[in-house]
Design a protein with these regions (language model features):
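Amphipathic, Lys/Arg-enriched alpha-helical "gate/interface" segment within cytosolic domains
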Residues: 2-132
Length: 132
């Protein structure tokens, strides 16, 4: 069944934050995700999260209102001090969408077809090895 809110899991181990997205996200789903990230960030000193890894294996899509909300969210990412975002298990549609979202950003954005490809570049990421 189509559920437009989406589900997510967040784990942070400074300087990394890990997000796992599942399902389809509309405006409300992106708002819940944003609030979850802000809450997670509040558990650490400001600007300690520098790298974000996003698992899109079970991610389906964004609605148009969800995309607008996501673009607004990422506009504030620079203020949070993120230096790099890595997307794992990305398909061509999601890649196109996230490339548009990050188009005018100074944040380094990388796309990996699977976990193994990510680990070739980041072999010491124990969270990914153990949990994804």
């Amino acid at each position: 069944m189509f559920g437009a809110h989406g589900e997510f899991q967040i784990c942070s181990q400074p300087p990394q934050m890990y997000l796992k997205l599942k399902g389809s996200f509309n405006n409300e789903g992106i708002t819940l995700l944003t609030n979850g990230v802000v809450q997670e960030l509040s558990t650490h000193p400001e600007n300690t999260i520098k790298f974000v890894v996003v698992n899109l294996k079970e991610f389906e899509l964004l609605t148009l209102d969800g995309l607008d909300s996501l673009e607004a969210y990422f506009a504030g990412v620079k203020e949070r001090g993120y230096q790099r975002v890595d997307y794992i298990n990305i398909n061509i549609i999601a890649k196109n969408m996230f490339e548009k979202v990050w188009k005018n950003s100074d944040v380094e954005v990388n796309f990996y077809k699977d976990t193994e490809s990510y680990l070739l570049v980041h072999p010491s990421d124990s969270y990914i090895k153990q949990n994804w």
